[in-house]
Curated annotation (Swiss-Prot):
Family in the record: Belongs to the tpcK family.
Pathway annotation from the record: Secondary metabolite biosynthesis
Entry keyword set: Lyase
Tissue: Specifically expressed in conidia.
Organism encoding this protein: Aspergillus fumigatus (strain ATCC MYA-4609 / CBS 101355 / FGSC A1100 / Af293) (Neosartorya fumigata)
Gene Ontology biological process terms, A to Z: secondary metabolite biosynthetic process
Lineage start: Eukaryota, Fungi, Dikarya, Ascomycota, Pezizomycotina
Endpoints of the signal sequence: none
Record EC number: 4.1.1.-
InterPro entries linked to this entry: Dimeric_a/b-barrel (IPR011008), EthD_dom (IPR009799)
Keyword Transcription regulation (UniProt): no
Protein name stated in the entry: Decarboxylase tpcK
Domain named EthD: residues: 22-117
Principal EC category: lyase
Amino acid sequence: MGESSRKPSRYLCLTICGYRKPGMSEEDYRRYMTEVSAPMTKDLMVKYGVKRWTMVHNTTATRALMAELCDSQMTNVVDFDCFSQVVFESLEDYKRMKQDPWYKEHLFHDHENFADTKKSMMTIGWIEEFVRQGVAVDGMDN
């Protein structure tokens, strides 16, 4: 089999811990991200090899649910508005996506429409998967 058909041993996961633009409501933020930003972004991500992109919207209402889960080990609740996770194999492919002229023209400045880009934070690490769709698994699917 060719090199491209091999299953990588692991994938990188870029996690953006996002805050919404000051003055924007939680619902407007979620709506903009899911109805404007995501449709503009997802095909470009696929073009550059992104395997998965998800958003977790951490609203005031969902943060309140943490009161039911807190115990002596789980006491600190974060206040980020969203966790956006991008899973990919190649850091170089992701960097090439950010250099794509369409990204630069349409997406780079769009973040200012909904995100507090100065306050939001990011990290990257290896993703490991153990349960998928209710089934125990040993790693990510290709």
